[in-house]
């Protein structure tokens, strides 16, 4: 008998999910980018136990239309593109249609969402990729998604995660970079019930720098402005007395 077999759909989904979602920070990135693509002006990110037990993202974006809900957790289902030609003019952060299905395959999910075109919102609860609850609810326009028990059904992947403290470092780095690149969005970051920072969402980069790094650091920043017919550069660079032994605090955002 031959040795090559066709894998079942459940195994395929879990393997594929590991390529997209490799740690809690990946979940945070994908969910925040979904909120940004939904034109949210306010995003709240909450994590517990390094994101292993809970990752919650709340936004006031356009929400998910009720008729789109059945496709939300299907692989390669997306509202961002319709054909290969759209890749040449894509303006969204997400487009592959893999993030939500990948997250659902390796975690428990609670989702509440309402679009401005629907009278009622929808609540969905999922366990290991399967919907166990779905009902209509009254809620605000936008989306609330809670990802719980990440990798509970893939012990090998869970084993290779670092300590809660280390995973939290990756998450914090992700949230900070997204906040710095999206100064027009108010972003609140909560860790284990404590607010770490909240940006004003007023479009002022220096205000975001102050929220994340503190007023002392903000006062040591110098503005950088340059533009020509091809590009424009806007940002801040620190004075010499504020220096680090590595390049981790050098952050670039292209077409942000």
Which role fits each region the language model picked out?
Residues 1-256:
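N-terminal phosphate-binding caps/lids of nucleotide- and nucleic-acid-binding domains
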């Amino acid at each position: 008998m031959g040795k090559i077999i066709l894998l079942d759909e459940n195994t395929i989904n879990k393997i594929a999910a590991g390529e997209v979602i490799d740690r809690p920070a990946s979940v945070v990135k994908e969910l925040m980018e979904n909120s940004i693509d939904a034109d949210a002006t306010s995003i709240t990110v909450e994590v517990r136990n390094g994101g292993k037990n809970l990752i919650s993202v709340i936004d006031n974006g356009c929400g998910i239309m009720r008729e789109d809900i059945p496709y939300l957790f299907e692989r390669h289902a997306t509202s961002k593109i319709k054909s290969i030609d759209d890749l040449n003019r894509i303006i969204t952060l997400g487009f592959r249609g893999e993030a939500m299905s990948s997250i659902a395959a390796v975690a428990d999910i609670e989702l509440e969402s309402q679009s401005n075109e629907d009278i009622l919102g929808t609540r969905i609860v999922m366990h290991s990729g399967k919907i166990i609850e779905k009902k209509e609810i009254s809620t605000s326009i936008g989306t609330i998604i809670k990802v719980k028990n990440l990798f509970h059904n893939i012990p090998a992947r869970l084993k290779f995660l670092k300590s809660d403290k280390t995973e939290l470092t990756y998450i914090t780095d992700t949230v900070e970079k997204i906040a710095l690149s999206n100064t027009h969005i108010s972003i609140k970051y909560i860790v284990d019930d404590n607010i770490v920072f909240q940006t004003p969402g007023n479009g002022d980069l220096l205000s975001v720098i102050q929220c994340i790094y503190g007023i002392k650091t903000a006062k040591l920043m110098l503005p950088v402005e340059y533009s020509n017919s091809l590009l424009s550069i806007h940002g801040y660079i620190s004075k010499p007395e504020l220096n680090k032994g590595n390049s981790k605090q050098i952050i670039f955002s292209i077409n942000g």
